[in-house]
């Protein structure tokens, strides 16, 4: 009888890994190796071999993993929640859930740096910006930030840069702000020497000490204040005013821009995004036109393509960290694009009337609730409110909380004498009557119908919104499910994501986001929990986070993990803050020098600056490695002030630097700590561990190495791992044992997407994770070897091998043919590919990272495209193709151009079908090459009129 494998362990590994066994061996043979172990042994430096401490179980099957995580999710208790405080239940419209959130065309896309293949999500983001601009009454809005609290911190530093009160280091923050926002403000302010003064704005007599102010609108306790006079006073004192505003409330309230606010920030969570135990959610940031060049975050703008037709792109990128480094407006790289797009489509689907109707329903239910509570003898502290009430409940407060929880209801905990209630989109008449029952104490409940008939708005007449909202046709057209479904399909068809093609972006790790990993994200057991719910209700999340932290410790060799940072940039920041606090705890406050190699990603110096450190750049040698002697000299020179080294490993040049242990030793010998940037961890899991070869702290990108999708530019998760001496300095939170050092609004950051990483690790197991790293290295070296005859590979290790990515040097081709790296990137679109990373870390190069998920067939398809492009460049070099009018200079080619008058000296077929395989399935870019200069010189960051597309 044939032996049958009755087990299901490790089944998923072959689903995640691209190359089949025969292909894998052929690729190894092309490199001169007979096994993955031999290749790994040759790539990994001797000094760090054997440092991996990965001791995980076998991988679970997809069915078993889903069953296990379903059991974990079931331990979370779903109470009816009225906690509010910036987080509200809402309904995610089913067509948005099915056609956007659960659609890989949307969630597997990358940040839209290549505009020609990103027009769909750029349009969705432009809708988001228009939504924010309309509701806040300010003309410029960005394409999202990480959460409301970090947006408030960005507003604070924004005010500091722009305020004319240059001698001031004090920032006023209203005591009516959400407490989690105040905590993050304090964290961000301290390293920058900013003093956050928290007070009651109604009692503020002297505003002259402040460079800026943050006001909450409506207030966290529910009050709606008129800030006009106060704003004028701040402006008279040369201070700027930021307003944290509730988007749904702004459909009914006078917008901040109309009462003089300089900045509006807040969260778009209640526009269709689940609570998710705190995230991910899209924050917003809008401001006056005069301040646009100092805005943080991405900004979508309208430009034109080479045919003069409207086209969208990311505008004013010179503000950002990848260009300005330590002088950037922010260190933020990943934002919250997927969540911003959900909020955008929520507004598109409901339109201005629908949003206003939801807001009016919420407000009137709150008014009915308040009237009923008053009739029951409960003191309601607010007379003007939108959706939130503070109740003076005195000695009964604790008993009322207990009574509510016994009925599976959460009320907001304020103090021993008061509690809070926030009504939301999901609240019903039955809910209001149940709430009355909590407070009735045997009294007859009020008559809902009678109170509803008499209910009136409590918003003061002076604050009732008069200006229209969302008048653009996009918000007034797609209100049936059929229309919205087709609109989302039309937008998705304009873009390239992993559902169509590999995305070989170096330093980005665009690997498979498996369907089984994604499924738990939409479960109510994970999505419907409030981040400030009592701990006993989140036992499932506690188990999930405990297990995930242990898994990540095993993968990295660190002793402790914090899952709070909600982006890689925030992980970097939290890591440097831990180092800073460690030095301070030892009485070494003077240590503020951060050494950073010249090859580092721009987030590194931008983050060091935010953490109050001075950046000293160290040199790299001709092979792309850190110049150890220059590093040693600078470490010794600054030994009394040395705080840290930030180094990426494997390096941003795509190689395992052989001197990494020596590098770490130099820093430690001179009193510093070593921050190993984990952006390239996909080459190390199961092979070597940064916590075991000299790292004191690293951040990980769960949206790279551990399979959380990029979402078109977010969400991301950037947890940090630390050695035990830094554990006391990990981020805290007001709802955790350690209160200090919060870097984002929620205790566990983007908690609701952590199941993705849990699923990936449990299904891959220890052997699968190691194999993934080995295949990532194999695929990169296979591409490097296939293309090295056509393009110089800029950096390799001493054995001629790369790590998990390779850099092709196109600079000689610019000299010989006039063809630029940009031309090659755009020509790849005609072949159906997203371009590799352009001009980073070296100008004029392409950095390619294929990941382990791509098959040999797909790798060959990409290599064939690159080789054919080299042939076209050669034709330009020898004069066969015109140096100005050729397929590369004119790429990408659109269908409209193909059927129009053809004036080029090369054929239509050469333009759009340069290889025969494209005939089977062709991606058509919706626009020609986008004019970046025009877009920045003629900045438009809201939906243009329909006529402009004519």
From Swiss-Prot:
Residues the record lists as N6-(pyridoxal phosphate)lysine modifications: 704
Q: Which Enzyme Commission number(s) are on file for it?
A: 1.4.4.2
Sorted alphabetically, the Gene Ontology BP terms of this entry are:
glycine decarboxylation via glycine cleavage system
Which Pfam families is this protein grouped with?
GcvP2_C (PF21478), GDC-P (PF02347)
> Which cofactor is essential here?
pyridoxal 5'-phosphate
What family, per the record? Belongs to the GcvP family.
> Quaternary arrangement and interactors, per the entry?
The glycine cleavage system is composed of four proteins: P, T, L and H.
User: What is the protein's known function?
Assistant: The glycine cleavage system catalyzes the degradation of glycine. The P protein binds the alpha-amino group of glycine through its pyridoxal phosphate cofactor; CO(2) is released and the remaining methylamine moiety is then transferred to the lipoamide cofactor of the H protein.
Q: What is this protein called?
A: Glycine dehydrogenase (decarboxylating) 1
| Gene source species | Pseudomonas fluorescens (strain Pf0-1)
């Amino acid at each position: 009888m044939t032996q049958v494998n009755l087990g299901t362990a490790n089944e998923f590994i072959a689903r995640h890994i691209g190359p089949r066994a025969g292909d894998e061996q052929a690729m190894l043979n092309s490199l001169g190796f007979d096994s993955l172990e031999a290749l790994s042994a040759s790539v990994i430096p001797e000094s760090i071999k054997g440092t991996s401490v990965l001791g995980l179980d076998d991988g679970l099957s997809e069915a078993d993993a889903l069953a296990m995580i379903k059991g974990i999710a079931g331990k979370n208790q779903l109470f009816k929640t009225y906690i509010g405080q910036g987080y509200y239940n809402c309904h995610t419209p089913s067509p948005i859930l099915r056609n956007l959130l659960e659609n890989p065309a949307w969630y597997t896309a990358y940040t839209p740096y290549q505009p020609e293949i990103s027009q769909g999500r750029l349009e969705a983001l432009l809708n988001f910006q228009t939504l924010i601009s309309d509701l806040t009454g300010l003309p410029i809005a960005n394409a999202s930030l990480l959460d409301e609290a970090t947006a408030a911190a960005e507003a604070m530093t924004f005010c500091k840069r722009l305020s004319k009160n240059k001698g001031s280091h004090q920032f006023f923050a209203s005591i009516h702000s959400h407490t989690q926002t105040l905590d993050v403000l304090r964290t961000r302010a301290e390293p920058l020497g900013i003093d956050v003064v928290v007070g009651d704005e109604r009692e503020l007599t002297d505003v002259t000490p402040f460079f800026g102010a943050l006001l909450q609108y409506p207030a966290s306790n529910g009050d709606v204040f008129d800030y006009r006079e106060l704003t004028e006073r701040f402006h008279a004192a040369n201070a700027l005013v930021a307003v944290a505003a509730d988007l749904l409330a702004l459909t009914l309230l006078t917008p901040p821009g109309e009462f003089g606010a300089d900045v509006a920030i807040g969260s778009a969570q209640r526009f269709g995004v689940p609570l998710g135990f705190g995230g991910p959610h899209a924050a917003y940031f809008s401001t006056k036109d005069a301040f646009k060049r100092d805005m943080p975050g991405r900004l979508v703008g309208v430009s034109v393509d080479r045919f003069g037709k409207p086209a969208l792109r990311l505008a004013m990128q010179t503000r950002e960290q990848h260009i300005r480094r330590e002088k950037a407006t922010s260190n933020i790289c990943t934002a919250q694009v997927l969540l911003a797009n959900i909020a955008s489509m929520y507004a598109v689907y409901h339109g201005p009337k629908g949003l206003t109707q939801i807001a009016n329903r919420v407000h009137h239910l709150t008014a009915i609730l308040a009237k009923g509570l008053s009739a029951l003898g409960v003191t309601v502290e607010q007379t003007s409110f939108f959706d939130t009430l503070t109740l003076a409940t005195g000695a009964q407060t604790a008993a009322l909380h207990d009574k509510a929880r016994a009925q599976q209801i959460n009320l907001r905990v304020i103090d021993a004498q008061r509690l809070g209630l926030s009504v939301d989109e999901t609240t019903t008449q039955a809910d209001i009557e149940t709430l009355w029952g909590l407070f009735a104490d045997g009294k007859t409940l009020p008559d809902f119908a009678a109170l509803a008939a008499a209910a009136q708005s409590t918003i003061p007449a002076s604050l009732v919104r008069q200006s229209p909202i969302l008048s653009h046709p996009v918000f007034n057209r797609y209100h049936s499910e059929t229309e919205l479904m087709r609109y989302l399909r039309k937008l998705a068809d304009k873009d390239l994501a992993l559902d169509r093609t590999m995305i070989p972006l170096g330093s980005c790790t665009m690997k498979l986001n498996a369907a089984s990993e994604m499924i738990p994200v939409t479960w109510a057991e994970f999505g419907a929990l409030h981040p400030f719910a009592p701990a006993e209700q989140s036992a499932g999340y506690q188990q999930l986070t405990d297990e995930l932290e242990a898994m990540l410790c095993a993968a990295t060799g660190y002793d402790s993990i914090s899952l709070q940072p909600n982006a890689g940039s925030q992980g970097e920041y939290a890591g440097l803050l831990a180092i800073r606090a460690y030095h301070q705890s030892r009485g070494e406050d003077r240590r503020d020098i951060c050494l950073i190699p010249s090859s580092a990603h721009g987030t590194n110096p931008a983050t060091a600056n935010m953490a109050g450190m001075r950046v000293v750049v160290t040199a790299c040698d001709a092979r792309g490695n850190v110049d150890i002697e220059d590093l040693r000299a600078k470490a010794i020179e600054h030994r009394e002030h040395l705080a840290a080294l930030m180094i990426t490993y494997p390096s941003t040049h795509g190689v395992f630097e052989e001197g990494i242990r020596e590098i770490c030793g130099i820093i430690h010998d001179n009193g510093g700590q070593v921050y190993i940037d984990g952006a390239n961890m996909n080459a190390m899991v199961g092979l070597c561990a940064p916590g075991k070869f000299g790292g004191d702290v690293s951040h990980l990108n769960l949206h790279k190495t551990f399979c959380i999708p990029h979402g078109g530019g977010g969400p991301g998760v950037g947890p940090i791992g630390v050695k035990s001496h830094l554990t006391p300095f990990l981020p805290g939170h007001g709802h955790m044992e350690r209160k200090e050092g919060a870097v984002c609004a929620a205790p566990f950051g983007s908690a609701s997407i952590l199941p993705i990483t849990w699923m990936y690790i449990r299904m891959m197991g220890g052997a699968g994770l190691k194999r993934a790293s080995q295949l990532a290295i194999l695929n990169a070296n296979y591409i490097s070897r296939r293309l090295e005859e056509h393009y110089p590979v800029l950096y390799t290790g001493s054995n001629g091998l790369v790590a998990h990515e390779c850099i092709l040097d196109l600079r000689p081709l610019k000299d010989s043919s006039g063809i630029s790296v940009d031309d090659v990137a755009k020509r790849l679109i005609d072949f159906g590919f997203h371009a590799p990373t352009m001009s980073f870390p070296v100008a004029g190069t392409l950095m390619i990272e294929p990941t382990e998920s791509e098959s040999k067939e797909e790798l060959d398809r990409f290599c064939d495209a690159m080789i054919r492009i080299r042939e076209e460049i050669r034709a330009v070099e020898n004069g066969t193709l015109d140096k100005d009018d050729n397929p590369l200079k004119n790429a990408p080619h659109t269908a409209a151009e193909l059927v129009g008058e053809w004036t080029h000296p090369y054929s239509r077929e050469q333009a759009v079908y340069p290889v025969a395989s494209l005939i089977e399935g062709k991606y058509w870019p919706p626009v020609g090459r986008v004019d970046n200069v025009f877009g920045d010189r003629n900045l438009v960051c809201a939906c243009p009129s329909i006529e402009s597309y004519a």
